[in-house]
Amino acid sequence: MPKLKKLLLKVSTSKPNTNPPSQNEEKGTIVKQEAPIHVSNVALVCPQTQTPTKVGIRIQSGKKVRYAKKSNQTLDEKN
């Protein structure tokens, strides 16, 4: 969903959705339904600590390098 800037992930991103009672049923039902999350709520997982982390950029030998701010570990290199 690029126009909405939302992602539908394979992890459990479900929200409860209520269905009102119909004429035949006594009670309404609560159904779990997959829901998209906004791009700003997605975080990179640090490979060392296995927790969400922010990403920093530093220059090493003339190249931009991304690193995890929690563990200070290099993630990959960019040109």
From Swiss-Prot:
Alphabetically ordered keywords of this record: Ribonucleoprotein, Ribosomal protein, RNA-binding, rRNA-binding
GO biological process: translation
Region (Disordered): 1-29
GO MF annotation: an example: rRNA binding
Record's keyword annotation contains Magnesium: no
Assembly and interaction partners: Part of the 50S ribosomal subunit.
Function: One of two assembly initiator proteins, it binds directly to the 5'-end of the 23S rRNA, where it nucleates assembly of the 50S subunit. One of the proteins that surrounds the polypeptide exit tunnel on the outside of the subunit.
Name of protein: Large ribosomal subunit protein uL24
Species: Onion yellows phytoplasma (strain OY-M)
